[in-house]
Amino acid sequence: MTDWTAGYIADIGYTFGYYTELNPLRAQFALLYGGFAPPAGSACCELGFGQGVSVNVHAAASGSEWWATDFNPTQASFARELASVSGASANLSDESFEEFCRRQDLPDFDFIGLHGIWSWVSDKNRQVIVDFIRRKLKVGGVVYVSYNTQPGWAPMIPIRDLLTDHRDSMTAEGSGSVAQVGAALEFIERLLDVNPTYAKVNPLIVERIKQIKTQNRNYLAHEYFNRDWAPMSFSRMASWLDSAKISFAVSAAYLEQLDPMNLTKEQVA
């Protein structure tokens, strides 16, 4: 029997939230500030829409045509119900990336967005996504991708490995993701309480774990406990997307474009 989850957490749903960076109109402002002419945005796509809040808001509040998929049928069902009661005309499916990206009825897109997807899927799925962008993004189109970066996420890599190792070896398979997350976090906290050398070298990791423990367990399961989890450097990210014939334009976070707020005079020089 094929595991349709491909190692992704599926026994519990993702959290409900709106992600403003997926808004093509917001992307237009970032591009204009960076000196780029944005596309019209008449055809848009979201890969991995979660509970579908963002894609439904964007479909209902704009004249753009939206196509999107999320392989979790429970989340796709909720997103479709949200579309039916809101009047949003989004085309929503529960297909895997491989299934969705090979469809012949999809238009070419001005905007393709992925939020919380890239770092949490396999290399095989990343290649499917890159090939899809290469074939279906219009000339002059925009891709928004959020991902966990190196070196910022580097201290969390061994911690995350311990979390999943504890889940795989120390908890019952049928106990469910929420219980497994809680048990793994308790283990990490006990480990850090004895002040290992790793905590001395990375003092901020203790506070980070304390902060993580306060977060929603569904979010944590999807953030840290999938089979695939790959923070990567900017250069590696650029290398992945190079074959799709796209390159970095601007950050979706407006304030990151303001050098005086983020860099010293010496760093700017």
Regions found by a protein language model. Name each.
Residues Q51-G63:
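Conserved SAM-binding loop of SAM-dependent methyltransferases across substrates and taxa
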Residues Q127-V139:
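A short glycine-rich, Lys/Arg-flanked "PGG" loop and its adjoining helix->strand segment in the class I
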Residues D11-S42:
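Conserved alpha-helix/loop element of class I SAM-dependent methyltransferases that forms part
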